[in-house]
Amino acid sequence: MAKIQKIKGVADLFPEDSARYAFMEKTARDVFSSYGYGELRVPILEKTELFCRSIGEETDVVQKEMYTFPDRKGRSLTMRPEATAGIVRAYVENKIYQPGKVSKFFTFGPMFRYERPQAGRMRQFHQIDAEIFGAAEPQADAEVLLMLSSFLSNIGLEKLSFELNSLGCPECRPKYNQALKDFLASLDREQLCDDCQRRMDTNPLRVLDCKSKNCKALTENAPTLPDHLCGECREHFDTVIALIDEAGLQYTLNPRLVRGLDYYQRTAFEVTSGDIGAQTAVAGGGRYDGLVESLGGPKKVPAIGFACGMERLAMLLEGEFEPAADFYVALVDERAAKDSLIFGEKLRRSGLKGEVGFTAKSMKAQLRHANKINAQKCFIFGAEEFENGTVTIKDMAEGGEQETVSRDEYFK
């Protein structure tokens, strides 16, 4: 019978890989909780309308990348391509909003997009996501950036680049959009890729987000958003910059940074690395003050957040992440199988972590496995130990000592 293999674009995460993800999740919990964030878990499946209304009908995500299907009652459902929309939906549906109330959430989990699989880009991928609602002040933008920086630093990633821009607001964006349309109209339309030709009519800002080298070259002299900001947006962005300058965060202003989702306005940012190939962005986010209202919530609820791609971060992490075992119980004589199993259970009940050998093997093979799991100590059950009610304890450090003691005395 033929083997059943995993589908294209997904991965099996074995213990050595899962340990990296667990390390990132634990670090995120520790860092985010220190800023007052609480964990929120939202469904993987949502109504398709949620993403059409939030991400934008004309975005590549909605047009080409979502896993969407009808359920048995004909309702259109989508496996979430990102986390923010689901968190906003939960925020609105559960009426968490109150005047003056600031709410902070984080979440982890798998997301799904139908993309061409490559290093750092999978069809099922994992994100760490953080969002804050109810804070319009630039201090919130600065705190989000500093919290993201703290998380990345705490997982050992220092050589990353922060890029920032302001995308304006509904007051100043239309003037910029017109200036951009006028510029794009001056280009030879046929020289742009098919996607950008479509975007010129539906969402001109997305042209600046194109990854095609040819499109980037053609739009190199396009007008920039920072040159078209209204007074309030300029003041907001200048204050954000002043705050992160004071905090010592290193960054670069990138006037071409627009992000790939329609809901962003004002502050937008990306974190990039030059060490993971073509997919350089490892995190990104921004402010989305109009999204709560567009999903049925009250008007003018400010919000800002970010997401980190765990697959891409995992590619940058160095070192071993599987925790060392406290012990390994080596079964050398089959007669001691019951005694060794019970001894290992007592060790675990005392707060230690480790394994018990189920099959009698040579001492050499047992020690090899103890070294493989980085056990601190090896408890040996051979013929002599079985007959005398003892256990031999070997310190697995190089040149470690070995001693034989009574099993009954060991736990006293």
UniProtKB/Swiss-Prot annotation:
UniProt KW keywords: Aminoacyl-tRNA synthetase, ATP-binding, Cytoplasm, Ligase, Nucleotide-binding, Protein biosynthesis
Any Gene Ontology CC annotation: cytoplasm
GO molecular function annotations of the record: ATP binding; histidine-tRNA ligase activity
GO BP annotations listed: histidyl-tRNA aminoacylation
One Pfam family, short name: HGTP_anticodon
Family, similarity comment: Belongs to the class-II aminoacyl-tRNA synthetase family.
Subunit-level organization: Homodimer.
Protein name in UniProt: Histidine--tRNA ligase
Organism whose genome encodes this protein: Maridesulfovibrio salexigens (strain ATCC 14822 / DSM 2638 / NCIMB 8403 / VKM B-1763)
Gene encoding the protein: hisS
